[in-house]
Amino acid sequence: MKLRIFDNEGERFYSPFNLAIFALLKRHRLSENAFFELVQGLSPYTDFFNINRYVEEYKEGDIFSDIFIEIPEELRNYKRVTEAVFSNHFKNRKSKDGVDVYWDFYNLLHDYLDNPSSVTIDKLLTCFENNKDKLNKAFGFGQNIFSQRTGERPSPEEFANQYQEMFEADLNTYLYQKFSLSKIFDQIREYSDTTKRIFKATGIISFDNGFVEIAYRELCTCIFEEAVIQSRVAGNIYEELRPEYDSYSEYEESVNSFYCDVTNLSQVLEYHDEKIKQVEDNIQKEFLGVSIEKIPTIIADKRRREFAEFINKHYPSEKVKEILELFNDRSNDRHIKEAVSPDATVPTIYEYMVGLAWYYFSGKRVDILNSYNLTLSANFEPLVHAGGGLGDIVIYEDDKVLMLEATLMNANSQKRGEWEPVLRHSINLKVEEETKNTRREVTSFFIADSFDANTINIWKAVAAVPLQSSLEKDKFTDNVVIMPINTDELSSLIDKESEYDEIISKVHKLFEVDKVNFDIDWREKFMEGIV
């Protein structure tokens, strides 16, 4: 909400995120292309006077009809220009070959204009067919400039009638306008992927089947008042009356600026006590008959139901098994991202799939959505893996707590990268449960594609010794259970849902066998006897 794009003087600004929220409040649903054009196509130099009407009536492609293209003086004539002039205005910074293709195409267009015949049409269409991708991207917004199938040749009369707009106009002006607008179109499409990732990461904007909506709409409409958000879409920083800043430099130039400072949403939107009370009242009206304290539970329950529907539709158990099998070979990484989420790393996707496998293993009874410590999009897609201070997945049940630690590190790397954090997370979780006296059994599962033999045995051995919490140094625990399970074994457990409780109980008994009395002061006592 604080992100702004400023003009060169650091005065006028445009806020893409506020525009996105405003558009989705007003329109409810937009196609992805229309959404990206709206958000990325505006700037601090845009006239926002009729932004309400503009957003309300916006159709895909409208952004390009509103852009004025200044035609260079050298191109303001009907004549064929020189190659030097052409190259100066029709540039391709990625490839000189591209400019050569444009030049050939330009000359063949003029050849046709000079002599409209079957011969010149054939040469023109042959050039187009051989360079279709480059030419469509440069002059056709990614669409076909000519609609003829490969090898198809219309008569001169048919061709002239079909492309009358192109050939009756000033060709130099026509091509330059198409070239300039296609470049803007290409930039919007190129950056749309990044824009999509950023908005998905917020968790409140949903992308599904080519459409964009606000997630938790019933809640967001209470929090984001349309008129307030509209007023924040654009403005002049010197006309704002904010105590936190009064210039561009104070807004975002330093680490102590308003932009870099940690601020809550009510501060950003300037919601004071009276306004916050109004928001609470609006939420109360939306959830009629429910106390304000119960509303988060209602929303969470709805979110869990939506997640269950999403999993049933997109990740049935057999598909989960198929995807898990792909992790055996890291050359499958591209296929894994295509199957799950191009926005997430493969290790993040592995954590996600481990959780789904466990969901099926439990007979769908565990709340895997709230057990993930990785970040999910509003569409339940994985985005960012769990932070270093937490277990990857922590599942709280009535009688037990399970922690799943997932890694794609190979057997050798595990010794350096996983031993300490997995052990630390397991100890801290068990100490926390014992401190709260919950009487729940705590079990950790270390899930990887393969294991080092020492890793397996060390996890078994640590159950026999007392271990110290890293968070509360005065607290110790023993019988820390860390059970290694490989990916193939986890996949097999998906079909063992009827044995879920029994298998976890067997794991505990397996580790309890080796529990022994252990003197945690053994080293000190020994050293006192010899020094």
PLM region spans:
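Donor-sugar nucleotide-binding helix/loop cap in glycosyltransferases
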Residues: M1-N256, H272-I292
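Catalytic core segments in nucleotide and nucleic-acid processing enzymes
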Residues: E250, Y259, L265, E270-V531
